[in-house]
């Protein structure tokens, strides 16, 4: 009897784990999504497993796991060939900024070319939304050839934020969400004029499994509530 109960508990646990909604989120949006998921669980709607990373990491995980939803830049989701999205729900607009370390004098985007700015961190363009936006900006503003020797390319936005916060680099190209999250640790930030990069539309992209998943559909509705919109606005979306 005891053996049977153990097997029954294991079966139930396995069933619960299998039914847990799994989502993937661009690393630059971890902070607001963590807050959203906390609110979702506190209201008794269930637990959601979320993984965070750059786009390459997300696509790799989504192919191996039953990911139902991906929260990221719509352009990245549309151009990749590995996953088939059936719907996109708007969450907000991403804003690219230049964050600078404490003690660094930085008043305009042109200051990137100053001799006083020795190092510029940014995420990798092929793997991260704001790396792509950063490269667009540097090329469109005709800065790239003048600053390419200063560039330090890393995998994710959080890495760039960390380097700026600890003054391992003078400035970094990140999103407004990350800059606001680190505002006490950095010197400040300047928004990159929208004219220099393609608009960034942050969406919840639904995969096929989401269509018939009640938990997934409920979460999508939850994302549209006024309380959740307030969270996204607070984090610069």
For each of these PLM feature ranges, what is it?
Residues 47-56:
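A short beta-strand-loop structural module common to alpha/beta enzyme folds
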């Amino acid at each position: 009897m005891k053996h049977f109960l153990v097997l029954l508990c294991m079966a139930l646990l396995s069933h619960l784990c299998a039914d847990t909604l799994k989502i993937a989120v661009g690393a630059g949006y971890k902070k607001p999504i963590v807050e959203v998921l906390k609110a979702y669980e506190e209201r008794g709607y269930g637990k959601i497993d979320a993984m965070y990373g750059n786009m390459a990491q997300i696509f790799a995980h989504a192919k191996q796991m039953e990911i139902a939803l991906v929260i990221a830049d719509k352009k990245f989701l549309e151009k990749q060939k590995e996953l088939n999205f059936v719907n996109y729900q708007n969450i907000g607009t991403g804003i690219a900024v230049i964050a600078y370390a404490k003690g660094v004098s930085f008043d305009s985007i042109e200051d990137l070319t100053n001799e006083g700015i020795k190092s510029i961190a940014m995420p990798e363009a092929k793997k991260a939304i704001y790396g792509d936006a950063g490269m667009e900006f540097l090329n469109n503003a005709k800065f790239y050839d003048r600053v390419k020797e200063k560039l330090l390319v890393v995998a994710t936005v959080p890495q760039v934020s960390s380097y700026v916060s600890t003054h391992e680099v003078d400035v970094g190209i990140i999103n407004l969400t990350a800059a606001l999250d680190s505002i006490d640790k950095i010197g400040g930030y300047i928004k990159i004029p929208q004219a220099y990069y393609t608009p960034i539309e942050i969406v919840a992209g639904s995969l096929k499994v989401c269509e018939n998943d009640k938990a997934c559909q409920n979460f999508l509705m939850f994302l549209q509530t006024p309380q959740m919109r307030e969270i996204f606005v607070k984090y610069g979306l």
